[in-house]
């Protein structure tokens, strides 16, 4: 079986002190890049897609292509539902073969968040599907959802302990000062808060908003218990910038088999860098 749950993957990372990258993909080319690069580096891999990605590319297409690539490269991987908000949506995708989900109820009050997440956990665990949830809110833009910086909330360590105990989630996405999208100025991450959460919570922790973070910050977060690092915007920028440059240099280009190559190569360099920073090369 090549499409797997991320639970054991993250537990192994937690015990060994590295993190597994979760790369957001959008189409055939971006999916090819992350799978091929992870296979070359023998890195565990989580392929992430937002509701918008699954709507755009097609649920069946993503699962089929990812499964074919995983078999071709002998690379078990997790296809992960990133920032999904609907139990019904998650149920349908789990029944279609997904085994790793994130239910995002972070915009709800604490008790409503707990209730929603618990309902997802109760369903998903019947199908050996791992569940990630978020406590606190990241600022920035994710899948056309905008969270203003004033509405971003840091994760409360004591609440995190209660949240994990009451919901039974497999991993916890924490808010410690990161944001979705690229940073206008270098962010100041609250590593003291992260250490407090780690002391109270024994499941793998997840860092969203890693695009553009200094490598030293990512490494420090991993040393304090982060086992999954999400990267999306940095991949899109590398891909689209290379594509734009190709058309500037080749304005009459019309063959996607040619103009997609430099875009894929640029994205591949970002994927290689992230795998290296996460310390997961050779961890298969």
Swiss-Prot record:
One Pfam family cited in the UniProt record for this chain: F_bP_aldolase
Broad class of enzyme this protein falls into: lyase
Catalytic function, reaction form: D-tagatofuranose 1,6-bisphosphate = D-glyceraldehyde 3-phosphate + dihydroxyacetone phosphate
Cofactor remark from the record: Binds 1 zinc ion per subunit.
Residues annotated to bind dihydroxyacetone phosphate: 181, 209-211, 230-233
The enzyme's E.C. designation: 4.1.2.40
UniProt keyword annotations, A-Z: Galactitol metabolism, Lyase, Metal-binding, Zinc
Cofactor(s), by name: Zn(2+)
Disulfides per UniProt: none
Binding residue positions for Zn(2+): 83, 180, 208
Biological pathway: Carbohydrate metabolism; D-tagatose 6-phosphate degradation; D-glyceraldehyde 3-phosphate and glycerone phosphate from D-tagatose 6-phosphate: step 2/2
Active-site feature positions: 82
Family: Belongs to the class II fructose-bisphosphate aldolase family. TagBP aldolase GatY subfamily.
Function: Catalytic subunit of the tagatose-1,6-bisphosphate aldolase GatYZ, which catalyzes the reversible aldol condensation of dihydroxyacetone phosphate (DHAP or glycerone-phosphate) with glyceraldehyde 3-phosphate (G3P) to produce tagatose 1,6-bisphosphate (TBP). Requires GatZ subunit for full activity and stability. Is involved in the catabolism of galactitol.
Protein name: D-tagatose-1,6-bisphosphate aldolase subunit GatY
Source organism of this protein record: Salmonella typhimurium (strain LT2 / SGSC1412 / ATCC 700720)
Lineage, uppermost ranks: Bacteria, Pseudomonadati, Pseudomonadota, Gammaproteobacteria, Enterobacterales
């Amino acid at each position: 079986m090549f499409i797997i749950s991320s639970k054991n993957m993250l537990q192994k990372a937690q015990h060994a002190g590295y993190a597994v990258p979760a790369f957001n993909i959008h189409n055939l080319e971006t999916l090819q890049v992350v799978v091929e690069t992870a296979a070359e580096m023998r890195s565990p891999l989580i392929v992430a897609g937002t509701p918008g990605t699954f709507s755009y590319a097609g649920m069946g297409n993503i699962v089929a292509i990812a499964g074919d690539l995983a078999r071709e490269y002998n690379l078990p991987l997790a296809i992960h539902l990133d920032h999904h908000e609907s139990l019904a949506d998650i149920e349908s995708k789990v029944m279609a073969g997904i085994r790793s989900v994130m239910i995002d109820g972070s915009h709800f009050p604490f008790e409503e968040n707990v209730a929603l997440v618990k309902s997802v956990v109760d369903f998903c665990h019947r199908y050996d599907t791992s569940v990630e949830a978020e406590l606190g809110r990241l600022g920035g833009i994710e899948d056309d959802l905008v969270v203003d910086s004033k509405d971003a909330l840091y994760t409360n360590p004591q609440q995190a302990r209660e949240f994990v105990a009451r919901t039974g989630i497999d991993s916890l996405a924490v808010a410690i000062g990161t944001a979705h999208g690229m940073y206008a100025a270098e962010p100041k991450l609250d590593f003291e808060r992260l250490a407090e959460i780690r002391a109270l919570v024994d499941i793998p922790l997840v860092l969203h908003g890693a695009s553009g973070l200094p490598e030293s910050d990512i490494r420090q977060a991993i040393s304090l218990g982060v086992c999954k690092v999400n990267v999306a915007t940095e991949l899109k920028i590398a891909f689209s910038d290379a594509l734009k440059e190709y058309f500037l240099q080749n304005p009459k280009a019309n063959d996607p088999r040619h103009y997609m190559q430099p875009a894929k190569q640029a994205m591949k360099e970002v994927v290689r860098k992230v795998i290296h920073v996460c310390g997961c090369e050779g961890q298969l």
